[in-house]
Regions:
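Phosphate-binding/switch region of NTP-binding enzymes
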Residues: 195-230
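Conserved inter-motif catalytic segment of the P-loop NTP-binding fold
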Residues: 87, 95-98, 106-193
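Detector for small/aliphatic-rich hydrophobic stretches
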Residues: 2-5, 16-93, 110, 114
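Walker A/P-loop
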Residues: 101
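Residue-level signature of catalytic and energy-coupling elements of molecular machines
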Residues: 22, 79, 127, 167, ...
Length: 230
């Protein structure tokens, strides 16, 4: 049976408090403390067993040579160290209206790979009109307008794309926790799940994130440390 309790955490530094505070005493940020619902499930320690097959000496671990996905943009390839690394999670942030979605859509329809573009902000028709302005070659780019993480993962399992795009992380929510869409716990939980998917499948995920009026990425500060590239 899951136990539920409420705590309050700072979006800026991650400090936690038993009650709401107008100013975070750790970093000094005002109005950055939000309610967070934590659900914990007690595990029976006697049922926990060690899987010895997962233990490997480092010299016995085999590595795979996975080629990076090359982008038709020399500057972006340079920034990413030569292209998109399989299984990596890339966070693209910027002010609203600056062109994040257009840039990522341009990449999606130009890399000649099967791309699943998930939008929680625009309709398929809006994305199609923008794609028409970018290029006539629009094959292998699949558009899904959805905000529920569980339904998104079902689409990923069905399509098994080469690249996944999330536009934007602030619009995605999971049924596994009760917090509202865009809240700090939702962003952390959804990002954590997407990272697991990327590492387990080898599918790189490009995540678009908004920034605040202060120029910081909206949501928990830890988000920047969870992903591979910002």
């Amino acid at each position: 049976m899951a136990n539920t309790k409420k705590i309050y955490s700072c979006n800026n530094c991650g400090a936690k408090y038993p009650k709401w505070m107008g100013q975070c005493s750790q970093c000094g940020e005002w109005n950055s403390v939000d309610e967070e619902i934590i659900q914990s499930k007690k595990k029976n320690e006697s049922n926990i067993t060690i899987n010895k097959s997962k233990l490997k000496e480092i010299k016995e671990i085999e590595t795979e040579t996975n080629e990076r996905i090359i982008i038709n943009d020399n500057e972006l390839n340079r920034v990413l160290g030569g292209g998109i690394v399989p299984g990596s999670v890339i966070l693209i942030s910027g002010e609203p209206g600056i062109g994040k979605s257009t840039l990522i859509l341009q990449i999606s329809i130009s890399i000649n790979k099967k791309v699943l573009y998930i939008s929680g902000e625009e309709s398929q028709q809006q994305i199609k009109l923008r794609a028409n302005r970018i290029s006539d070659n629009q094959t292998q780019c699949y558009i899904l307008t959805e905000t529920n993480l569980e339904l998104i993962l079902k689409s990923v399992e069905s399509l098994m794309p080469d690249v996944i795009v999330i536009d934007s992380i602030q619009t995605i929510q999971t049924d596994s926790i009760e917090n509202i869409q865009g809240s700090t716990p939702q962003i952390k939980e959804c990002t954590s799940t997407l990272i697991k998917v990327a590492k387990q499948t080898g599918i790189p995920i490009i995540v678009i994130g908004h920034i605040t009026k202060d120029g910081n990425i909206a949501g928990p500060k830890v988000l920047e440390h969870m992903v591979d590239v910002v």
